[in-house]
From Swiss-Prot:
This is Trigger factor. It catalyses: [protein]-peptidylproline (omega=180) = [protein]-peptidylproline (omega=0). It comes from Thermus thermophilus (strain ATCC BAA-163 / DSM 7039 / HB27). GO terms for molecular function: peptidyl-prolyl cis-trans isomerase activity; protein folding chaperone; ribosome binding. Belongs to the FKBP-type PPIase family. Tig subfamily. It is an enzyme of class 5 (isomerase).
Length: 404
């Protein structure tokens, strides 16, 4: 039998009573299970009498194991019976007496109740997309940069040049002066083919530890193609004007996507800010751990451990700010997740089979696998979460249409 003793926001105090006959049956099952695994001198494995096993293991230890087993068995039944959706729980009281039932009290952090703000009255302050001629010209210039060629020049090296050099050890390699370390760039600027220069090598503190004799073999510069009809045709445009129109249309599509994404972001942030909810601490801690795991993965790819990164923040006196920012970001993400979930519950959009299949195909492409492999990797529960995410996406889009 289970009953709610006290309820305050997300925190629910629950009392569970287990009848004596079930306690007795669980104790006997526990003893038999242990007897099959415990070695008792003078008996073959699994053949020692239960009383002997009980005496060997000690009744107090057995009763502690019994309490844990009973909680494991009855807690899920109790929360189902009471209609709770726990995110965390702990047992705060236990009472197990000889020949009687087992009673315990658990403090449950229940999934929070959420109330949305009046989102239909939202005014989203997002500037509409605009594509200027200046943006078109910049995009065309970037195209020229992308199709530029390196050509040799017989002059001194300038800031954006590329040098091909050979060290005294015989190693030959190119150096892009625009991306070179400042002390390397300084040593090579103004040099031409045939010049020999001593390039300093610095330690972690920026101190010179030695010099490397380096010969400049060749100086090259980027030659940009002319923005003309011929260049347009190399990009499969019919004319220069056609190329400009294509670039303009591409920029408009990008601007429209950015605008829609900005509207969605502004809507969700406003929705989350106005959410009436008391979030259980365990949900926030879980999201903080999730964020730290992602950070650790990013740092690992750079050859840095999370521990070393946090220690460096501590040395610089920035650890407290990092932790505070982490807490704020975790709360923001949890609030947005709860807001999306509640909005989908309110609008209840339907996901057609065609939409679901298209979503699966897009997800499979993103993961670089087939739809069949995606289904296998995600499993039934993972696919259910994926479908719920699609349903929530549809709810957000429906809400944005309402706002116009």
């Amino acid at each position: 039998m289970a009953e709610i003793l006290e309820r305050s926001g997300y925190l629910v105090k629950v009392r569970v009573e287990v009848p004596a006959d079930r306690v007795k049956a669980s104790y006997e099952a526990l003893l038999k299970d242990l007897a099959s695994r415990v070695r008792v001198p003078g008996f073959r494995p699994g053949k020692a009498p239960l009383k002997v096993v009980e005496a060997r293991l000690g009744r107090e230890a057995l009763l502690q194991d019994l309490k844990e087993r009973l909680v494991e068995e009855t807690y899920p039944e109790a929360v189902r019976e009471l209609g709770l959706s726990p995110v965390a729980a702990r047992v705060v009281e236990q009472d197990l007496s000889e020949g009687e039932g087992f009673r315990y009290v658990a403090e449950v952090e229940n999934y929070p109740e959420v109330r949305l703000p009046d989102w239909r009255s939202f005014a989203l302050e997002v500037s509409p997309p605009e594509v200027t001629e200046e943006m078109v010209e910049k995009a065309l210039e970037e195209l020229r940069q992308r199709y530029a060629e390196l050509v040799p020049v017989e002059r001194e090296a300038q800031e954006k040049d590329h040098l091909f050099v050979r060290t005294e050890e015989g190693a030959e390699f190119p150096i892009d002066l625009a991306k070179a370390l400042p002390h390397v760039r300084e040593a090579l600027l103004g040099k031409k083919a045939g010049d020999v220069v001593m390039v300093p090598v610095l330690n972690d503190k920026g101190e010179k530890v030695r010099e490397v004799r380096t010969e400049v073999l060749e100086v090259k510069t980027l030659k940009l193609p002319e923005l003309d009809e011929e260049f347009a045709k190399t990009l499969e445009a019919e004319s220069l004007e056609d190329l400009k129109n294509r670039v303009r249309e591409s920029l408009k599509r990008q601007a429209e996507r950015a605008y829609e994404e900005a509207r969605e972001r502004a809507f969700l942030e406003k929705l989350a800010e106005g959410l009436e909810v008391e979030i259980p601490p365990s949900m926030l801690r879980a999201e903080e751990r999730h964020l730290l795991e992602h950070l650790a993965e990013d740092l690992y790819r750079q050859g840095i451990s999370l521990e070393a990164y946090l220690e460096a923040l501590k040395v610089k006196g920035e650890l407290e700010k990092f932790q505070e920012d982490l807490r704020k970001e975790a709360e923001k993400r949890v609030r947005i997740a709860l807001a999306r979930e509640k909005l989908a519950e309110e609008l209840n959009p339907e996901v057609s089979e065609e939409e679901w299949q298209a979503y699966l195909q897009a997800a499979a492409r993103a993961y670089g696998v087939s739809v069949q492999d995606l289904r296998r990797q995600f499993g039934e529960e993972g696919l259910a979460r994926l479908k719920e995410r699609l349903r929530q996406d549809k709810a957000v889009q429906e809400a944005l249409k309402v706002l116009g």
